[in-house]
Amino acid sequence: MSSGGLFLLLGLLTLWEVLTPVSSKDRPKFCELPADSGSCKGNFQAFYYHPVHRTCLEFIYGGCEGNDNNFKTIDECKRTCAT
């Protein structure tokens, strides 16, 4: 196989790994928790996984407490929880 073919194969395998969804059996249990802004009064953009819609959505996090279904970026949420 030529070096171009190897690079293509490596690229396709990498793309497959990135785009393959997290299966529900591999998804952490905290991904099923509801969005929880916590008890503090801050105003921070955060993201949580919504299991019914099977996507990550934005919410406002107060800055303390809450639960583990709380991500700083939508990409982090998707990598961890999205199917």
Swiss-Prot record:
GO terms for cellular component: extracellular region. One of its GO terms (molecular function) is toxin activity. Residues 31-81 form the BPTI/Kunitz inhibitor domain. Expressed by the venom gland. The record marks K41, G42 as: Reactive bond for trypsin. It comes from the Eukaryota. It is found in: Secreted. Keywords: Disulfide bond, Protease inhibitor, Secreted, Serine protease inhibitor, Signal, Toxin. Its main location: secreted. SMART domains: KU. Residues 1-24 form the signal peptide. Disulfide bonds join C31-C81, C40-C64, C56-C77. InterPro entries: Kunitz_BPTI, Kunitz_BPTI_sf, Prtase_inh_Kunz-CS, TFPI/VKTCI-like. Negative results: does not inhibit serine proteases (chymotrypsin, elastase, kallikrein, and pepsin), cysteine protease (cathepsin G), and MMP (1, 3, 7, 8, 9, 10, 12, 13, and 14), as well as voltage-gated potassium channels (Shaker and rKv1.1/KCNA1). Serine protease inhibitor that acts against trypsin (EC(50)=10 nM, Ki=5nM), and plasmin (EC(50)=200 nM, Ki=100 nM). Belongs to the venom Kunitz-type family. This is Kunitz serine protease inhibitor Pr-mulgin 3.
